[in-house]
A protein has these predicted regions:
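Short coil turns and loop connectors of transmembrane beta-barrels in diderm outer membranes
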Residues: 37, 83, 98, 112-114, ...
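Transmembrane beta-strand segments that form the barrel wall of outer-membrane beta-barrel proteins
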Residues: 41-49, 84-95, 166-170
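Solvent-exposed loop/turn segments connecting transmembrane beta-strands
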Residues: 49-57, 91-102, 112-114, 174-180
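Repeated loop/turn-to-beta-strand initiation elements of outer-membrane beta-barrel proteins
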Residues: 41, 70-75, 114-118, 158-164
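Outer-membrane beta-barrel "beta-signal"
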Residues: 59-65, 181-193
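Cleavable N-terminal export/targeting peptides
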Residues: 1-36
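Outer-membrane beta-barrel strand-turn architecture
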Residues: 67-71, 79-81, 110-114, 156-158, ...
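Outer-membrane beta-barrel translocator/channel fold
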Residues: 119-149, 153, 160-163
Length: 193
């Protein structure tokens, strides 16, 4: 990648993130004019769970914002929850020379009781990682990838929760080049507004 290419990627990520926040904030604000724009904020860290040359070194700080423009929190049953997902927007920050991710998509939460829950999400991401098989990092093939995650969590009260999750990103062989993907596992602390 050229020096010019490296400079464009972070600027492209910033522009994409800003436009996604603006678009989602408009939807969320109109749906919940009386409520907070954000439904939940999560922060934490993850690490690569891959092995060999596909493993990423270091710890990845993470921040995720959730919006509830479809009223998922007020859904009365699982079928309503399924058709009324929350929207998430977040980042997993690469330390050292590892990939930074900016991701967005839909999230579904299943409550086992007032305290225990499971969550799944699906969407896409853009990253700053390695595209070709040049070194001991995942070769990702293209900058736009699918992003999915699953997790289990515990609510301490109506606001605070903790969740362990595993997230995977790859292009599902839809673009040319290698498809090592990135798989990270971690813990996040959440605050629900």
């Amino acid at each position: 990648m050229t020096t010019a290419g490296r400079g464009l990627m972070p600027r492209s990520l910033s522009i994409l993130l800003a436009s996604m926040i603006a678009d989602v904030s408009d939807v969320s604000a109109s749906a919940h004019a009386q409520d907070w724009i954000f439904d939940e904020l999560r922060f934490g860290a993850s690490a690569s769970v891959q092995s060999g040359g596909e493993r990423e070194d270091g710890v990845f700080p993470e921040v995720t914002i959730f919006f509830d423009p479809f009223g998922s929190d007020s859904a009365a049953n699982w079928t309503q929850k399924l058709i009324r997902p929350r929207i998430h927007l977040g980042t997993s920050i690469g330390t050292g020379s590892e990939a930074t991710q900016v991701f967005s998509g839909f999230s579904w939460t299943a409550d086992f009781n007032d305290k225990l829950f499971a969550e799944a999400g699906f969407g896409g991401l853009i990253h700053t990682g390695n595209l070709d098989e040049e070194d001991d990092r995942p070769a990702l093939g293209c900058h736009l990838l699918f992003h999915e995650y699953i997790g289990v969590g515990y609510r301490f009260d109506t606001h605070w929760n903790v969740m362990a999750q595993v997230a995977h990103s790859s292009h599902a062989n839809l673009c040319d080049g290698p498809n090592d993907g990135m798989t990270r596992a971690g813990v996040q602390i959440g605050y629900k507004f």
